[in-house]
Regions:
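Active-site palm subdomain of RNA-directed nucleic acid polymerases
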Residues: 83-96, 199-233
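Conserved pre-catalytic core of RNA-dependent polymerases
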Residues: 1-203
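Catalytic palm subdomain of template-directed nucleic-acid polymerases
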Residues: 135-152, 229-249
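Structured loop/turn residues at secondary-structure junctions
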Residues: 71-72, 225, 241-242
């Protein structure tokens, strides 16, 4: 999917052939977008490809819509991603391992194994609740997202640029039977966009903060530390020493 062309159908090989010439043009376009905080309308269009998941192929819910976007737009999004990472490193807690340099799912699995091992050593009960958000990327409310970014200290200029990207965005769905008419998208972040995991992680972090988990006593208390959740993107593991403790939190 990374090499697939977007709605403009310009292949990545053309960018590779033009080399320095295309770099100069893209640099100029990206600078202009940043300056005026507006995007070319073609860059706000996405082609969605339904990728089948496990289950009944006749059910729409068993497909994951992945967005194909232009390679020129990907370059600009990559630059914005670098800017967002600076805020993510400051705002996201250690319990969140997604998009953290040098960390991944193995780290979270290792932590769970360590917690279980220590719980056995100190003869503690341990209960885990595994949560996976349904249609996570699709349910992000845009207006709430912009407010969250502002509350987290992300610059007004960057937030405005992101908001304008999602304003009046259009999409079409392409299948083996053809392509639909263009339609407006009013909510959600794109599957397949490099910015989407960043935006969703900040959105989910705000939700977790408002649960008050950081203020409750529920969790596993080992070697003086209290841990009540571990996260990797939208996969969240809650933990406590009893069912009652978790319900109370």
């Amino acid at each position: 999917m990374n090499k697939a062309s977007g709605g403009d159908e310009i292949p990545v090989e053309l960018f590779q052939m033009l080399k320095d010439d295309v770099v100069k043009v893209l640099h100029s376009i990206c600078q202009q977008i940043w300056k005026i905080q507006q995007w070319p309308q073609d860059w706000k269009r996405s082609v969605f490809i339904p990728i089948p998941k496990k289950g009944n192929a006749k059910e729409c819910s068993h497909y994951c819509p992945v967005a194909l976007i232009s390679h020129a737009r990907k370059v600009r999004l990559k630059i914005l991603q670098a800017g967002l990472h600076q805020y993510m490193n400051h705002e996201l807690p250690d319990v969140q391992a997604d998009f953290r340099k040098g960390r991944g799912t193995r780290d979270q699995i290792t932590k769970l194994q360590w917690i279980i091992k220590k719980a056995r050593k100190f003869q503690k009960n341990i209960y885990f609740w595994f949560i996976d958000y349904a249609k996570d990327f699709e349910c992000v409310d845009h207006n709430k997202l912009w407010k969250i970014l502002k509350e987290m200290g992300i610059s007004d200029h960057l937030t405005c640029l992101l908001r304008n990207l999602y304003t009046s965005q259009e999409a079409t769905v392409r299948t083996g039977h053809g392509t639909t008419d263009w339609f407006q998208i009013g909510r959600g972040v794109h599957q397949g966009s490099i910015l989407s995991p960043c935006l969703f992680n900040l959105y989910a972090e705000y939700i977790m903060r408002n649960t008050g988990l950081d203020k409750v006593q529920a969790g596993i208390k080992i070697t003086g530390r209290n841990t009540n959740n571990l996260r990797y993107a939208d996969d969240t593991t809650l933990m406590a020493e009893s069912e009652e403790e978790q319900k109370a939190s």
